[in-house]
Regions:
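Acidic, glycine-rich loop-and-strand cores that form catalytic or ligand-binding grooves
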Residues: 111-126
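Glycine-rich, acidic and aromatic/proline-enriched surface loops and short helix-turn segments
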Residues: 118-121, 141-151
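Stable alpha-helical elements in mature extracytoplasmic
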Residues: 100, 112-115, 140, 171
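Periodic small-residue-enriched repeat registers in elongated scaffold domains
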Residues: 1-84
């Protein structure tokens, strides 16, 4: 199926929709402008009109998309919850505007540190993956949920997934708690240094006093 200007669908069950698009692999789909599945079966590619350079697919059963002004995905009808991949960005950013949030509760940083210290950590791979090349670091969702899944008002996450926004939040809370510990240690060290300097001054004064007394006693003899 080919629909649009210079749209070509050259193989079995291939679909091309748009302008200057080519679906040249079996069961492949090309949509938008200036994209091609490049003969790779089962692949899909979508492109905007920001360029006249054709974006090609490089693998079978793969997906490629080009949108020069980014991607915006929403998970509610009001479009207030979701994630952005902005223009020229290389990572997704979660919507985090304070004006879109409510029911704020403070978090005990020391409690978070304790929970992290008690949480099992592993290296692991998903079932069926190559153990030599596809290993990972990190906790299990069940352990993370057991430690941080409730906050006094409701549930946070579930016991099979780890939300990266929550994971980042826990890490920042822990870092803040460690910074408070570090600041307290620095203050204690500063006070200890002051006391040590005063003690040294007193010792020096006593030594000088003893020296003068010994000198006086020597003259009396």
């Amino acid at each position: 199926i080919a629909i649009g200007k210079n749209a070509e669908a050259n193989f079995n069950s291939a679909i091309a929709i748009g302008n200057d698009v080519e679906a040249s692999g079996s069961y492949s789909t090309a949509m938008g402008s200036y994209v091609s599945t490049s003969g790779f079966a089962g692949s899909m590619t979508i492109g905007d009109r920001s360029t006249t350079t054709v974006m090609e697919t490089f693998v079978t059963n793969g997906y490629r998309a080009r949108f020069a002004n980014g991607y915006r995905l929403f998970t509610n009808s009001a479009a207030t919850i979701g994630a952005f991949l902005n223009a020229n960005a290389n990572a997704w950013a979660a919507l985090s505007d304070v004006r879109l949030k409510e029911n704020f509760l403070p978090v005990d940083g020391e409690g978070v540190l304790y929970k992290i210290s008690a949480m099992p950590q592993y290296t692991w791979n998903y079932i069926g993956q190559d153990v030599k090349t596809l290993r990972h670091y990190g906790p299990m969702a069940q352990d993370f949920y057991a430690a941080f899944g409730k906050d006094g008002l409701g549930e946070i996450g579930c016991d099979t997934l780890i939300n990266q926004q929550d994971f980042l939040g826990v890490n920042l809370i822990a870092i803040q708690a460690l910074e408070k510990r570090t600041s307290a240690i620095k203050e204690d060290n500063a006070r200890t240094k002051e006391l040590l300097e005063l003690t040294i001054q007193r010792i020096n004064a006593l030594e000088e006093e003893n020296r003068l007394l010994r000198k006086q006693l020597k003259h009396k003899r």
